[in-house]
């Protein structure tokens, strides 16, 4: 099976257009594609005006779904900006629901042939809930200043508040447990984990290797988890705006971000990456 991969497209900075030259069966959109609040119900009659940005985003998803048999989309951190953590994924499912081959995953799976994709943001564990990291990252990263969390309870009650580093660590734990239970005992099946935040410190550029606290907002240390689950053959992520491609046991870990067009040099030379599983 051929799998094409891109993350961190950041359509708010500029459009991106690419073809399926490799004949990939699946395209992975690994988060930070666009901000949820900027995309509304599709109106092909309104191509300018206040919905111009929204229609650009719809056009991007439409092109992807026309050129690739299947498209998997998981949200990153930026999709939530200026919105509510609890409503981001439902909003995308609502406004993009007209695309039948677009699979939006959040702690969910989708299977094609003998490969099961496990998708979700996979926030970090904040350096295993290190107190300094939980405190400092809340001040250092926009994620915890411009994302609300309505904290709805099962009976429908809720209270206003910001999305916090503790919320992120809790969501990390829930995602890891979902992966664990999904792959448990299924050694005859191939699994691909599609996340946004990195599962390993190996996805850290050398210039940042000594920044313990900040790295806690970008990656976790799931190397042993990956080694303990050899049925996971591929793990994709984004978030770092750096290319990575390495092995942890039988699992290939790959990151292929576009980045900020007109702001990062890598974005001007970015190319779609295709893998085989």
Kindly give the residue locations of the regions a language model identified.
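Active-site environment of divalent metal-dependent phosphoester hydrolases
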Residues: 10-16, 34-38, 78-88, 109-111, ...
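Beta-strand-turn-beta hairpins that frame and shape the catalytic cleft
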Residues: 1-4, 109-119, 189-190, 247-252
